[in-house]
Amino acid sequence: MPKIYKLFVALIIAFLPLTSFCNKQPLVSLQCEYLSNPLGIDVEHPRLMWHMNSKKPQQQQAYRIIVANSLEELNTDSALVWDSGKIKADDQMVYYEGAPLMAHKRYYWKVEIWTAGKKIVSKPTWFETAKIASSDWKASWITDTHDKEFEPSPRFRKVFNAQKPIAEARCYISGLGYYQLYMNGEIIGKSSLNPGFTDYSKRVLYNTYDVTEALQKGTNCIGVQLGNGWFNEQTATVWCFH
């Protein structure tokens, strides 16, 4: 009997966090380009999407999307970047059709949903743009002087000075192959084998990182280590073919 009692208590404790989590779900979940609060949106008309979290089936009859430059403007419906107006439709994915988006800017948005006799307003969320146009890129490609037969991994390092405390900082980085980014000795990002492979004659992918916490007022150091990729294949060292 004591064993049954202990097991019962353990199950109650195990399920409490799950129940608590379910109760904290927002009434409406929002995403931009299938991401929640994404950095690095670089399309002119991103897809805004949502779904209702309800225990009972609800049929959406109409919606309204509101996009603003700031959270304050969003909450007061003032100086909106886009107001779709009330649209009678059950669509839950809509392309942004407001004023042209600016590069390197955070936008706040929310959705109002009408169901049968009820209006639901989502909590505010945001998306942040990166390089909207090719002209937004100011950087130049860098490389070392060795050919692809040189096996050691190239490393680049740059020391710079921040005159003021860092409010916000982003890093936009790409490589024709793979890279590992460091700032002040810390690895930036949790993923590997970035960026993804494409036909480099047509398109090159890049990654966006929020590096605010990695930087400091005063001296900072950024480093990049390059790995073999599609422009510098080393078959034996990468795939162990001999």
Q: Model-derived features: where do they sit?
A:
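Bacterial Sec-dependent N-terminal signal peptides
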Residues: M1-P26
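Recognizes extended acidic, P/S/T-rich segments that occur
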Residues: M52, Q58-R106, E112, A116-V121, ...
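Accessory beta-strand-rich segments of carbohydrate-active enzymes
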Residues: W50, I87, M93-V94, R106-K110, ...
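Short hydrophobic alpha-helix segments
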Residues: L30, S84, K123-T125, S191
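Exposed beta-strand and adjacent loop surfaces of beta-rich binding modules
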Residues: S29, R47, Q60-R64, E168, ...
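Pro/Thr/Ser/Gly-rich low-complexity, intrinsically disordered linker/stalk tracts
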Residues: N23-K56, W126-A133
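Short, solvent-exposed beta-strand/turn "edge" segments of beta-rich domains on protein surfaces
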Residues: P38-D42, M102, E149-F150
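Low-complexity, Pro/Ser/Thr- and charge-rich linker/hinge segments at domain boundaries
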Residues: L30, T129-E151
